């Protein structure tokens, strides 16, 4: 299975160069973490990144669609930004605060996910990451409106500690926890998961 490459919002010719290099790999989709525009470390290294407005996203999206590629935008934290991504023609968004490392005091993704999912439901795929560690976490994110859930750091830890088998074991545990949580919340199919299973005090 091939992965989905994510690139930074590089400036000018470097962006096209990066896009062309990943297009050549023929991945299932190509992503861009637009919140990386806040990575001061890249500028200090002489690798400037730039904010992406609707016009810039539309241009990138059109270019990738011409090449037969789907485009995912990562770093969405508000309904208005999600709607901008939809109007630009993006195929999917990732609700993500970059692990809280870009802007201090950002809300968690679980807090903002429901309103974002409601804003673009039926127009694009909504993915989410952020502090997802167990199968129960996966269930909660789906119940809050995500179409699918991304897990990053724990997979890296599993790979470093146990290689391919470590990753398989980790996802095996996630699946077992997820199925048990579905059973205990009375959900028979993933498509039946809804906010009704959540306790919100």
Predicted feature residues:
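Hydrophobic residues within beta-strands of alpha/beta enzymes
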Residues: 30-32, 93, 149
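Alpha/beta catalytic cores of nucleotide-metabolism and tRNA/nucleoside-modifying enzymes
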Residues: 111-201
